[in-house]
Amino acid sequence: VFDILKAKESFMNYVRQFDLTNDKIHLKLVHTLEVVRTTEYLCLYENITGVERDLAYLIALLHDIGRFEQIKRFNSFDDRNIDHAKLGVQVLFKEGMIRNFIDDDQYDEIIEKAIAYHSLYKIPNNLEPSLLKQVLLIRDSDKLDNFRVKNIESIQTLFSISDADFYSQRVSQNILKDIENHTLILKENRHNEVDMWVSYMAFVFDLNFKSSYLFIRENDYIHRNMERLHFIGDLKEDMLFVEKTCQSYVEEKCM
């Protein structure tokens, strides 16, 4: 049913129509391929094999396909412009592009819903078990690769602001409270770019597989992501609190 190599080829053909010299487009291309790799890691450790594994790979390949059109239109990752998950579903299923990636339509509903739900703050209750597993896999893989992205990309590429503007901010009190309470941060509750940065670290509070925590620990992502930025004064104090809280949460989950 699945020809992952053909699907990858179709994906690359689709992406070539966009401006690959645009940092944001390039970021999302690499991110997609890395999410496939992270999915391989999770499937290996969670003993997910056969059709279930191939389906997870395909969903990983397609999960952010709406991002390319979003960046082309707005040159931004901000979902207040347009919801990239809904846009992905539209491109694949309303415009029929899904058949470029898989001939058989029996998995369409799972693929469509996994893409639609991958970036929601909270997924719907009572999902059918095979769908739930795919949704949890893509949500974890996506979040895990975000730690890699935050480890290498510039402030300018990530947030479209200067380093000086970024470092002049403080973490909002409600955001620090969410960290203290081990809570995933709602987009609407973020007030500035350092809040956004902290919200990415808070992804650790919404992972579903033990292997996801092992992956973060193996790569030392919490510490490395905090260490690479040059926080000073009060902002540094805020960030040390965030780092310590997230780090100890990961350690606990690895036990």
PLM region spans:
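Acidic/His-rich, divalent-metal-binding segments that scaffold phosphate/diphosphate chemistry
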Residues: 1-86, 128
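Acidic/histidine metal-binding catalytic segments
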Residues: 47-58, 98-116, 130-137
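Divalent metal-dependent phosphate-bond-processing catalytic cores, especially two-metal-ion Mg2+/Mn2+ enzymes
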Residues: 23-29, 33, 37, 41-52, ...
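Hydrophobic/aromatic-rich structural module bridging two neighboring secondary-structure elements via a short loop
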Residues: 68-110, 121-123
